[in-house]
Amino acid sequence: MTSQRTRERLIQRLCEEGVSNPKVLDAIRRTPRHLFVDEALAHRAYEDTALPIGHNQTISQPFMVAHMSELLLEAGPLDKVLEIGTGSGYQTAILAQLVERVFSVERIKVLQDRAKERLVELNLRNVVFRWGDGCDGWQALAPYNGIIVTAVAPEVPQALLDQLAPGGRMVIPVGPAGEVQQLMLIVREEQGFSRRVLGAVRFVPLLNGPVA
């Protein structure tokens, strides 16, 4: 289940699906995904599929985690990334190995607490967590040169656009909850924002308000 051979099969699959950034692949290879799912699902941890983590949330499929991370890093190294939707902490753990600092916002307290414990166990200490409404971002620590959103919004929240630094990149799924959505790459340029649609995806909805 957790053997190196099992993880290498996942890496091979990601490469076949088009992931090519060696740093992203190494981070996926090093990260024990089975620690981020319930024990009953641990035997499926290295399948390239999303899995439930409770509270109507999921851990994203490894390909999507790798793809979004790769898009974020496409223009070069990042030192300050905002993650909206900590969830299990798996995407957080990948980012923590790729960028200097991660600031992660989660609205469901129990999920955030579990994610914190997992990252401490993995000795990933360059992450700061906030329990709150992800739609608001984290204005107090803005701007960010990367923003990654792990839940779908009907439209891009203005607060997140405002918190993106000049030249910064945001990867976000946009569209109606429960239907086919579009993954978008947004770049803050001198004259405004450029937007590139990257393909169809399906994510859980980005909801308002923290939950204890």
Curated annotation (Swiss-Prot):
Record's subcellular location: Cytoplasm
MF (Gene Ontology): protein-L-isoaspartate (D-aspartate) O-methyltransferase activity
GO cellular component term, pick one: cytoplasm
The UniProt record lists the keyword Coiled coil: no
BP GO annotations: methylation; protein modification process; protein repair
Coiled coil location: none
Subcellular location, principal: cytoplasm
Family: Belongs to the methyltransferase superfamily. L-isoaspartyl/D-aspartyl protein methyltransferase family.
Cited function: Catalyzes the methyl esterification of L-isoaspartyl residues in peptides and proteins that result from spontaneous decomposition of normal L-aspartyl and L-asparaginyl residues. It plays a role in the repair and/or degradation of damaged proteins.
Name of the molecule in the record: Protein-L-isoaspartate O-methyltransferase
A Pfam family per the record: PCMT
Species whose genome carries this gene: Pseudomonas putida (strain W619)
